[in-house]
């Protein structure tokens, strides 16, 4: 059952006071200092210059920002009319370490925010404030939490500061973003019960973080006028621009294995119903369990502007599809999406993701990897991407070119490393007014200045 929380109408002054008390930034030292915005672009490619601060977004353009925090995944979308959508809030608490697949000493050798105790959501907060100076919109109109993994919504432990608004949650990830900004709506895969495929607040290995997130959302729903909804597959009316001035559509493709069929708003449930779930240990789902792993429950969407299309699928993967065909959630989502211009790599480019079949159907001109450990993306996945899509351009927020953990992954070849178009920074896709073409920029991250390091394009939307 889908539920939408409704609110009584409050007097204007009361609403103003309520929101003011709900979106005050926590008292922390800014990570990104205010910088000059530069000249407004007129849509000409030549106005984006390497070595200068990224030009401000202009009305009619659509921006897709892959914000690098070294702690997970975060995408911020500015629609042509200034409507703002935040997808995830990269804030794991993984320490700098050299333990197998979580090794991150390579990428953090360049920049390690954890040395100063800086949380991912603090970096995101300051980044969003710069973007909001362009748009004049101080509201995050929509937040989508794609799924309940810490590198997407925010880890939690006893060392984190408690929110000044409620003692029921601590500040990191989406809970901190909720405290720092006025927010219109939060969409996720579990509201309001968070009980599929089992009780997510008491059984998974990250139950403490999930409970912290749920407490924050419930507080802001009850006290701050935030709406919370289950992400609904198949529809185009859940995430909508504030105006109808531009042809922008956000199609919700899938959530919890409920996948759009391509026919109207019709969907098909591909995962077992809750009553049919069989899992030995919810804290460690195995390939033989009749239970979907958290990654394949991700919220999946396609954002379209004119001829431009962007596919983002959280941590979609196809692990263990030989045991249960429905555990390949990636391919059916690709089939119903069809061809796109830009794709966020599924599951950071990890193993058992971005299959040749899915890549062939999506056929992106550009793939962006939001990476946060040394083995993102896997060398085999990079090679597969280019073998499947020889002319595709690849961009990676953190790209480790040195030796990778023995027995986990191989070092990226010099030839493949040279093919990566942009890396080690924020990746920004800027779509021109009308959606006919776009450019991709890599901007500085560690200094917070958003200085342009690389510009690719323009690419022509198909």
Language-model segment annotations:
Residues 31-63, 69-71, 127-130, 136-142, ...:
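Flexible, acidic/histidine-containing loops and adjacent segments that form or flank the divalent-metal
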């Amino acid at each position: 059952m889908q539920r939408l929380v409704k609110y009584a109408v409050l007097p204007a002054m009361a609403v103003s006071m309520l929101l003011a008390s709900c979106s005050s930034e926590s008292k922390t030292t800014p990570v990104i200092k205010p910088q000059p915005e530069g000249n407004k672009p007129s849509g000409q490619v030549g106005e984006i210059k390497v070595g200068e601060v990224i030009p401000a977004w202009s009305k009619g353009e659509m921006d897709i920002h892959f914000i690098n925090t070294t702690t997970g995944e975060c995408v911020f979308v500015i629609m042509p009319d200034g409507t703002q959508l935040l997808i995830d809030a990269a804030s794991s608490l993984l320490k700098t370490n050299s333990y197998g697949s979580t090794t991150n000493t390579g990428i953090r050798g360049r920049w390690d925010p954890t040395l100063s105790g800086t949380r991912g959501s603090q970096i995101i907060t300051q980044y969003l404030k710069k973007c909001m100076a362009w748009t004049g919109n101080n509201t995050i109109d929509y937040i989508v939490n794609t799924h309940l993994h810490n590198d997407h919504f925010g880890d939690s432990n006893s060392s984190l500061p408690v929110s000044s608004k409620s003692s029921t949650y601590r500040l990191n990830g989406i809970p901190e973003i909720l405290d720092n900004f006025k927010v219109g709506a939060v969409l996720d895969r579990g509201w309001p019960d968070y009980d599929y495929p089992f009780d997510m607040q008491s059984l998974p290995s990250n139950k403490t973080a999930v409970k912290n997130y749920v407490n924050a959302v419930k507080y802001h729903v009850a006290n701050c006028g935030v709406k919370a909804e289950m992400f609904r597959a198949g529809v185009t009316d859940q995430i909508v621009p504030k105006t109808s001035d531009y042809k922008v559509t956000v199609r919700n493709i899938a959530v919890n294995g409920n996948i759009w069929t391509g026919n109207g708003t019709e969907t098909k449930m591909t995962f077992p119903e809750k009553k049919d779930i069989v899992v030995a240990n919810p804290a460690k789902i195995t390939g033989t369990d009749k239970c979907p792993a958290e990654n394949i429950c991700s919220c999946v969407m396609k954002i379209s502007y004119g001829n431009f299309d962007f596919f983002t699928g959280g941590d979609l993967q196809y692990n263990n599809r030989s045991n249960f065909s429905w555990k390949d959630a990636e391919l059916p989502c690709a089939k119903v999406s069809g061809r796109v211009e830009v794709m966020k790599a599924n599951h950071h480019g990890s193993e058992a993701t971005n299959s040749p079949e899915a890549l062939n159907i999506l056929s992106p001109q550009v793939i962006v990897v939001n990476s946060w450990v040394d083995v993102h993306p896997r060398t085999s996945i990079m090679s597969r991407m280019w073998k499947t899509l020889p002319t595709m351009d690849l961009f990676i927020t953190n790209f480790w070119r040195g030796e990778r953990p023995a027995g986990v992954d191989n070092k990226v070849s010099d030839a493949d490393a040279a093919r990566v178009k942009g890396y080690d920074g924020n990746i920004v896709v800027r779509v021109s007014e009308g959606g006919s073409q776009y450019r991709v920029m890599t901007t500085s991250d560690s200094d917070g200045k958003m200085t342009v390091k690389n510009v690719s394009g323009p690419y022509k939307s198909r």
